[in-house]
C-alpha cells in the first residue's frame, strides 16, 4: 500500500493540525506510520516550537484526536511515539457462517477502525506467502459476511460504524506464560 497524508485545519480548537490519510484504495481512518513521519516533519521543519526534551503535537484524524510525542536531542527528533484513540472490544469469540468457509470464529475490536481478528488455523491455512491469494480471498469473504450480518457500533463516532478489515493471526505462535481469560 502507498499512503499519503493531507494536512488540513484541525476540527478541534485543542488540536494543532488536521490530517486526512489516503492510500491506493481510497481513504483511511488512521495510519501510525504516517503519524510518526508527520511528527518528525512538523517538528524538524519548524512548524511547531521545539520543546526539549519532548515536543507534543495534537492531531485531528478521521478516527478522532491523537497525541504524538517527539523526543528531542540537539534540536532533532530522536524518536516518536503516540497515543491513539481509545480502543475497545465489541465481541469476543463471535461465530459467523461464511459461504464456502463454514463457521468462522472471530473477535471484533476497534483501534482507530473496526477489525475482525481471525485465527487462521481454524481455516486450515498457514500465514505463508505461498497462500497469499487464498488468504486475501478468505479475508474478503469474511469481511463481506460480517459486514452484512453484524453492526459495528462505536459509542460516539457514528461515522466509524463499519468493518474496515480482517486481521489474520496464528494463535499457535503465541506463548503466554500466565493464562488469561481468553487463552486458557
Please tell me what each predicted stretch does.
Residues 129-154:
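Internal alpha/beta scaffold segment
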Residues 1-14, 88, 100-103, 107, ...:
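ATP-binding N-lobe of GHMP and related small-molecule kinases
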Amino acid at each position: 500500500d502507498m499512503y499519503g497524508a493531507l494536512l488540513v485545519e484541525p476540527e478541534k480548537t485543542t488540536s494543532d493540525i488536521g490530517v486526512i490519510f489516503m492510500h491506493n484504495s481510497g481513504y483511511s481512518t488512521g495510519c501510525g506510520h504516517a503519524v510518526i513521519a508527520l511528527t518528525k516533519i512538523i517538528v524538524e521543519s519548524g512548524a511547531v516550537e521545539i520543546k526539549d526534551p519532548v515536543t507534543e503535537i495534537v492531531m485531528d484524524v478521521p478516527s478522532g484526536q491523537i497525541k504524538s510525542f517527539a523526543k528531542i536531542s540537539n534540536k532533532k527528533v530522536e524518536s516518536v511515539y503516540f497515543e491513539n484513540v481509545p480502543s475497545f472490544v465489541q465481541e469476543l469469540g463471535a461465530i459467523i457462517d461464511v459461504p464456502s468457509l463454514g463457521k468462522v470464529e472471530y473477535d471484533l475490536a476497534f483501534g482507530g477502525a473496526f477489525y475482525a481478528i481471525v485465527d487462521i488455523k481454524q481455516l486450515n491455512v498457514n500465514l505463508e506467502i505461498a497462500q497469499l491469494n487464498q488468504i486475501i480471498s478468505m479475508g474478503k469473504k469474511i469481511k463481506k459476511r460480517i459486514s452484512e450480518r453484524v453492526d459495528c457500533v462505536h459509542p460516539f463516532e457514528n461515522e466509524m460504524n463499519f468493518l474496515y478489515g480482517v486481521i489474520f493471526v496464528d494463535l499457535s505462535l503465541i506463548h503466554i506464560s500466565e493464562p488469561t481469560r481468553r487463552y486458557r
